[in-house]
């Protein structure tokens, strides 16, 4: 039961880590922009961009996929009312993260108070056009981008409208909540890169509180509770497996000793070691099948209930149940074989005399 649940949780964890997010999260570092550098952020960006191995630097108000929700904006009235998640960025952001434009253009230097919506927004609000206001009297739309994973898997971002937005010309209207996004070469030494970034930051803002992390770390942190629960279930599964092995070992020990004379007679009558082992294994295999049939609904229920916390989730695959059964079967067969091997190979005359 627990092994099945762990298998389902593993599927979702793997789905989270290996899904297409729509941007290059594995090569992007994120960190806070020190308050002391707010007025010199462009100079700071230039310093960081000049480091060997850095392919681009941008600024945003949030970290993608670090939360279940961000700013939610409502614009327009009546039939032209729109509601979407807003993600303030600078003009370099989409190119730094590798987010693809599907129509229109990317942001450029000098832009201010303009949107780039995702395809989900265009599908939900089909009247939105490039180079036109999102709604009458609102800011203009300069482009559309592919749907990306902008919040956690607890939401279905494939159907949720969102927009990247630049606050004021050259993001002049931003407050202090700014995040650095640094794209690095995939082959760069990560430890060395973090050290060099820290050196530049310390040089420009001595004593400031800063920390750079790869986006993968941030995403894992967003699922801390789910991953912790998975590890707990895995631990209980290992304990259950060990206890089961001890139980099977004890039963096999008792039965093999109890039937020692029978084993000797069977050996004299021509039974092979393999046939003796099969006699014991078959009995436990039947018990295993019965237990597995009873455990499947409970394992499915635990895994399915855990998946309910995710809006975007992987389907429960049949191979999880097959793999769980094969794993338990292998453990059982090895345990029975290990314990019965000695008695199955013992001199039958000696075992009969002993009895």
Label for each model-derived stretch:
Residues 18-41:
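Membrane-interface junction motifs in transport/secretion proteins
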Residues 1-26, 306-311:
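Alpha-helical transmembrane segments
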Residues 46, 50-221:
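Mid-to-C-terminal secondary-structure elements
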Residues 1-10, 227-261, 289-290, 294, ...:
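Hydrophobic alpha-helical transmembrane segments of multi-pass inner-membrane transport and secretion
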Residues 7-10, 282, 287, 295, ...:
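Juxtamembrane/transmembrane-helix interface segments of polytopic membrane transporters
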Residues 194, 203-239, 258, 303-328:
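Membrane-helix entry/capping segments
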Residues 246-287, 345-354:
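Intracellular coupling helices
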Residues 13, 258, 324-355:
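C-terminal membrane-exit region of the final transmembrane helix in multipass inner-membrane proteins
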